[in-house]
Amino acid sequence: MSLKNLNAIKIPKILKDKLSNRKIIKLINFFDKEFDIKGNFIVAISGGPDSLALAFLTKIFSLKNKISCKYFIVDHKLRKESTNEAKNVKRILSSFNIKLEILTWNGKKPSKNIQSIARKKRYDLLFSKCRQLKIENLIVGHHSDDLLENFFIRMIRGSGLKGLVSLEKKKVFNQINLIRPLIKFDKKDLEFISNYVFNFFIKDPSNEDTKYTRIRIRKLINELQKEGFEKDKLFLTLNNLKKSNLAVSFYVNENKRLNSFLDRDKNRLILDKSFFRQPYEIVFRSFSDSIKLIGQRYNAVRGKKIDNILDKIGKNSFNSETLGGCIIKKAHQTVIISKEY
């Protein structure tokens, strides 16, 4: 949309004043092409440059398209500054006619796997708010650098094809659409938006703490770039892997459709013997999806645990076991997965 067309839309003056910059207009237009959405949505804010840029872009989008959007930030209370930071972000966004609500993670905090557990808790709070407000779309600020970091982390952990391309632009979880419209944006462009529009963003000290795997990977990527590593080449590889993943996913979906039955009344999934007679990767993914479905998990169970239980199911001695919030039982020629309460 041109600057002239944007000026014709009813936009608060404090936001409209930021639309005189041609780079901002170019980034808004790029965002509009990437953000294909019709219904209302919730935006997850952290206070970092990525999420503040997302706050601005989604606000302009919602005004142009007359769509309702709501903004939430999670105060994890992992640092003593976090509550004041959340309140400061709320105050700054409020001055731009962006209403932000703070969600608080109360209770005991972990001493290990802090980032992973905090991420899960953040999504739990946000998904809960989506269900409460009957909004099906949750927008998050992952960008191209996150895509690269995720690829390297998964590769080091020995992930398969699906894991290597797991940061998808859109993912459905418990009927909530998790959407990442910034996945093709460079971090430097998001920092530009945040600085130009808000003249502010939070610098999280944990982003420099090398005790976290993601931070070590980030520094490794920076060093590789100094040695001539090109992001575009890796994005090409990722794109090819995604095509292969889609082909495998087709057969996974066929296996689930033809060889499993969902008993909604009893909240259980019945897997026919043919379910386990497919190529191993198809069985592995189909079974992993089944555990996620019945266990109502956001993240899949670790691959090694899936391997172990599939090995047991293949033996005549298998009776029952628990995994991922599910009870798995063998009954004659079928396997039944039910929710563990």
What are these regions (language model features)?
Residues 2-220:
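Core alpha/beta nucleotide-donor-binding catalytic domains of modification enzymes
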